[in-house]
Amino acid sequence: MCIRDRSQGLSTEIGWSVALPEYEGGIEPIIIGAGKAEENYMGRFPIQDRCSKLTSRILKWIELRKKPVDRIKIAFILHNRPCTGVEASIGDAANLDSLESVSRILHRMQEAGYSVDPPRDGKELIDTILSKKAISEFRWTPINEIVKNGGALAFVEKEEYEKFFNALSPSVRQKVIESWGNPPGEEVNGIPAAMVYENKIVVTGVRYGNAVVCVQPKRGCAGSRCDGKVCKILHDPEVPPTHQYLATYRYLENTFGADVLVHVGTHGNLEFLPGKGVGLSEDCYPDIGIGTIPHLYIYNSDNPPEGTIAKRRSLACLVDHMQTVMTSGGLYESLAELDRLLGEYEQVKHDRGREHALKHLILDEIKKSNLDSEIRADHETPFEEVIRKAHEALGRIRNSQIHHGMHIFGQIPEGEKKVEFINSILRYDDKESMGNRVSIRRLIAEILGLDLDELITDQSRISENGKSNGQRLEEIDSLSKDLIRTFINSPEKKLSSIIRGIFTGQNFAEKGINPAISQNPEVSQNPVIFQNPEVSQNPAISQKTAAICERVLDLESRIEKSLEIEALLHGFEGKYIPAGPSGLIMRGRDDVLPTGRNFYSLDPRRVPTKAAWRVGQQLSGVLVDKHLRDEKRYPENVGFYWMANDIMWADGEGMAQIMSLLGVEPVWLSNGQLKGFSIIPLKELGRPRVDVTVRVSGILRDNFPNCLEVIDEAIQAVASLDEPEEMNYPKKHSLRMIEEGADARGSTLRIFSSKPGTYSAGVQLAVYASAWKDEKDLADIFLYWNGYAYGKNVKGEEAHAQLASSLKTVDATFNKVVSDEYDLLGCCCYFGVHGGLTAAAKQASGRDVRVYFGDTREPQHVEVRDMADELRRVVRTRLLNPKWIEGMKQHGYKGAQDISKRVGRVYGWEASTQEVDDWIFDDITKTFVLDEEMRRFFEENNPYALEEMARRLLEAQSRGLWDPDPELLEELKNSYLEIESWMEELAGDGEFQGGSVDIVSFEDVPDWDRKMQEIRKILR
């Protein structure tokens, strides 16, 4: 097959031809030649258009290097998530205040001599964009208002656009015309032309001298609506971008004359347009979009999975940014009051009179805190068990980390934020993978004479002083920050004086080393520290303390060297941006500092690592045991959402878990690379082999095909073993599939994803567009989008029937969290895939399935929880936490946007799994919609985000997903009427959807319905 026609592009060649050069800062992996079989030999021939592409781009970089800065033009692209509201989500970027970042970059450009006239700050930038309506048309923004208010950066004439369009390949032109009509755009099947005014294409944006700021065009829909009819990408996952999308990028290159294109933040949609995974051709839409413009991409250093896609599919040179400062979530309001009552109870529980009164207060506070759904507190439950469960629940919340606002590009943490940042790095504890690098928590625990492993494992246990292990962990965290604060504030930063100070007892405060520690009764009154020579004169502790202090000094230095804006300006001049590693800084990857580099990922041949295998074994064991407790039987089939972050963040813990469930174990070469696997004998395994149904992310599919092949080969090997069916569920299910008509190979297909070249699960799009009527619709959409099989010699074969058959035996679905930097409300893909997989499994099997969520934040103490419990933890620690909310409020429009997106994802989880408690929706309503202070915040900064939240809440109630008290519902409705009046004033004239929720499923759209009928037959 010609490499141009291979849907996946490169596969086995990725490692040596693409990934390895990235380690040295190599960019733009463009294929310029390929092998072709001739009569008697394999010839190598150039690919003409690719050679032209490469040389054109090289010339652009060379020209950039020679150009004076006052003549350099820069185009900034702010991302947008139409499905979460175009008006509400301008500048979408994970954990980055993109608006303030762009403003500061423009100011630095002005200082460096660029001809730019920057806005005062990020607020002025977003206010200008919104007042001009320099965005795509959507619910509250008709095209005539965009033009009237000055949002049009340019009008592209039909004839001008056709010169570019007609130069595209015939297949590309045909696909675009079939979807969006002839240039400049026409109504097709009731879907209007995208951004066309008086037969001209409207390009939106705001100009600041030699810089423009544009909001990325919508992807896959058109018009001032959002419903199942206009959401064309739902009907066709491979739908090409609109004429206006293509025209925008060509205007920036050819008419505005951008020398550099800068996509701001993680992440946009250009790199996820249809086309090959890597090694793109002229028919791939990311390649068409980027053209020949040098491309710099501001990206979060903790996101190698998606950053790699941007590098390989949109030819981006990344300039990574620092991760957001993390801080302890802590307890608040009724949770803090419950904690106080529990502490008081431990002090007086032998006083019957006071104990009796406190019991009632504790039970009342448990109910008030909405913990009664997790803590059984009836007459049959011993009160000590209630107390234990309460401490356990509070421990999960108080010791979770949360984001302290957002990062601003080029701004390094200072003062207390620097202390928090360094502490979040040093607290990671995994003795096996960190070698001799002890965590600061383990050091402090050792100084206190405590066992950190015991504290983490059982946070409900009460010590002799009446404190729970969860409270002790919180105190250890506080002491850790005291030590860091002392060291970075010490003028001389002498290790010897710091270490001496820790062990000098009463002289501690006098020396001015660390009054906070010496005055802490947990330390100063602890004889283990100050009167016990075994500790105070322990050379091992002194050595570990010295090692921690050296790491603090090193981290502080590398934080200071994170010159992000300087690196970006370096790129503006066509200069080299050094390569650097990437990953989760709270997972031990502090080598991502300093930021401002072009990050690379990892060597996939080493996955899973030996440490990850141990974690994966634990995960599989805990999952099986939990299912045994819940259902009194082994799970026959577990449905997995396997993401690329498992490979890049966790070294393949999830991959190892899948292998362990199947009953195989990795075999490594002496250099640590994976050689293959071996079968674990049933006698040694001690349980049946568990089958798996894996929905793999498109990023993992495209960048780590070797990992897919290992799992696929393991499934085939296990299914062919000569073992009893009741001890080998993969074999049992494969035999059943053969009886139903599958061939031998088809019966072992267990790894599925979206069609090659596409990257969504479909379900999140349907949920956001209200394009579903019931769970069956979501199940059908999941099957329609994800019925393509992958594995050894299987590259995206259509396999809807095999997916449906495999889903019939799924007993539980699973995903996991590996760090507090990300959680299940952090992206719509979590509910779109995991929730969609759950809905599809329920519909295929005709029964409920368990929804589980793993937790490897502490790799040596893994947990598997019910999804409902994980949702409660995440909502309490972040979304409803006043500390997190205040951090978001510091970022105005962008903070309001991020709050709204999280609320939308709560709705998405309920729509797809029905695992969200009513009290969560109640508290969201009270906290964000009805609270006067919060309403003012949204009204002043981002009223569109408030409207989006309130509308979703009302939709949840109308669909029966939430059952609020009548009084609360009435307040919400009244508030929404007021919000809607604000919106109508902002919208102006013209036709627009506004706040109307129009439920349009595939049954209501003939073209879409025809495609879905076959899917419904398969699933039913």
Regions found by a protein language model. Give the residues of each.
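Ligand/cofactor-recognition surfaces for anionic moieties
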Residues: 4-1020
